[in-house]
């Protein structure tokens, strides 16, 4: 359900292969799908650094690897393995400012360890 490119990948064991494996967070809190910003789409996955689990491209935890969509009145649609969906409105000034940039929105800095939007996504992976 979550992305790892191949079984030999070092993080393959961290992937969910069955619904029963989704335990931390559980199916009602684990992010399954997110609406990605059109200036961030570069492959078939949404990348995010996860505290105590994974950091990508030698970046800090306060870095947006991929960037969430804001096309729904400043919010993105997210879905969860238990089948429910939510609309997550972004509030952090750094998130809103980055979304207005005319450049490619990959590897954008967040506002730091207190970035509430980034923390919200990180808590759901």
Question: Where are each of the predicted segments found?
Answer:
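Short, well-structured segments within or immediately adjacent to enzyme catalytic domains
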Residues: 1-125
């Amino acid at each position: 359900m979550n992305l790892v490119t191949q079984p030999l990948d070092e993080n393959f064991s961290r992937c969910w292969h069955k619904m029963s494996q989704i335990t931390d967070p559980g199916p009602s809190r684990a992010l399954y799908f997110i609406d990605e910003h059109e200036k961030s789409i570069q492959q078939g996955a949404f990348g995010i650094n996860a505290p105590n689990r994974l950091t990508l491209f030698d970046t800090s935890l306060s870095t947006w690897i991929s960037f969430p969509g804001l096309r729904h009145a400043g919010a993105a649609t997210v879905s969860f393995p238990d089948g429910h969906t939510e609309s997550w409105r972004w509030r952090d000034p750094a998130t809103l400012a980055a979304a207005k940039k005319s450049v490619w929105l990959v590897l954008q800095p967040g506002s730091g360890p207190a970035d509430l939007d980034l923390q919200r996504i990180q808590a759901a992976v």
